[in-house]
Amino acid sequence: MSTVQQAYELAKKQFADIGVDTEQALALLDQLPISMHCWQGDDVSGFEQGAGALSGGIQTTGNYPGKARTPQELRADLDKAVSLIPGKKRLNLHASYLEADHRVDRNEVKPEHFANWVAWAKANNMGLDFNPTYFSHPLSAEATLSHQNKEIRDFWIEHGKACRKISEYFGKELGTASVMNIWIPDGSKDFVVDKFAPRQRLVEALDEIIAEKIDAKYHLDAVESKLFGIGVESYTVGSNEFYAAYAVSRGTALCLDAGHFHPTEVISDKISAVMPFVQHLLLHVSRPVRWDSDHVVLLDDETQAIAGEIIRNQLFDRVHIGLDFFDASINRIAAWVIGTRNMQKALLRALLEPTDELRALENARDFGSRLALLEEQKSLPWQAVWDMYCERHNVPVGRRWLDEVRAYEKTVLSQRV
């Protein structure tokens, strides 16, 4: 019996003593996919021919060597990251990651431009999620779906429609629904006199985009708000209230991004607030440092609280977990592995909680016992259960994954000059 197995058997007994079945927890964890975001691997550059600079208030900071420059390099880097992460995974793509031998404008994207991604996903037994790309384009400089100019607005509406067909294609090819999330950077740097008209235009544009019914077996629409962005500090057309109302009234999923709110707000508190009103919720788990900085996800209090809300309320089939961070100052594969494994660790810790006992204490208003058990829970050997999970999935246990990342950096990433 290995050291990992010995530690697991001891941990299994300790959790059994408080009524928690570790085998059941591991089985449930296997059913909770994490959607990894492709854009960590190339600093949100994408593969459009003749693409412009990153815009829309999005910034990647740092210049760590080894950034993926081609679809082939990005998929190779993803292969390495996926090999170091246990459990069920998906990949989240932006429209700007299309592949073509000529320039394809945003309103002309087609499923065929993502055939290589579908083949890769099939080979890795992973689902795909999707995002229209409403930034880093000459026609996104002023606004997109809320633009006063109907021609520009129509261009972006066509992009949204085209992306829904790609998302549907993903779902049909891979046998799992693709969640397509709409986020736009539209807003204003300074004071706005007419805030209503852009929002009315956005409503009409979104309605036109989602007018064609697509089977939910293949595709789900989601909409994402933001408090502010660089260059749009004073007014954001797609605010939280706007998209919450839109999702409820139109039956779409709502996306909550951990970095898209005021620094004192947390999305863990918003999950139970919106779930009575929407069927599906998309999460972009991130780490905002004073603003939407998209730092790598930590195993911190908020990540744990997000996981706890999903597990305690058994929202397994209704909440879709995606990651959204991009750090160009560190090894990009390490960033994927750290962030994804941390999200999985948080879910496992939540699955190892004696929730029924805690809820009973809460209902009995025995808050002292509730606090005591929540604190004692932190000292239980969940790490041994996590190590067992990694071993069963044939991925490195503990810090050993870092050795593989360093070796890959030496043999592959260092050659990208």
Curated annotation (Swiss-Prot):
GO molecular function annotation: L-rhamnose isomerase activity; manganese ion binding
Top EC group: isomerase
Cofactor, free-text remark: Binds 1 Mn(2+) ion per subunit.
GO biological process, one term: rhamnose catabolic process
Signal peptide as annotated in the record: none
Binding-site residues for Mn(2+), renumbered to this chain: H260, D292, D294
One annotated Gene Ontology cellular component of this protein: cytoplasm
Keyword flag Transmembrane: no
E.C. numbers: 5.3.1.14
Keyword field: Cytoplasm, Isomerase, Manganese, Metal-binding, Rhamnose metabolism
Domain of life where this protein originates: Bacteria
Pathway: Carbohydrate degradation; L-rhamnose degradation; glycerone phosphate from L-rhamnose: step 1/3
Reactions listed under catalytic activity: L-rhamnopyranose = L-rhamnulose
Primary location: cytoplasm
Keyword Isomerase: yes
Cofactor dependency: Mn(2+)
Localisation: Cytoplasm
SUPFAM superfamilies found in the cross-reference section: Xylose isomerase-like
Pfam families in the record: RhaA (PF06134)
Family under the similarity heading: Belongs to the rhamnose isomerase family.
Function in brief: Catalyzes the interconversion of L-rhamnose and L-rhamnulose.
Name under which the protein is recorded: L-rhamnose isomerase
Organism lineage: Bacteria, Pseudomonadati, Pseudomonadota, Gammaproteobacteria, Pasteurellales
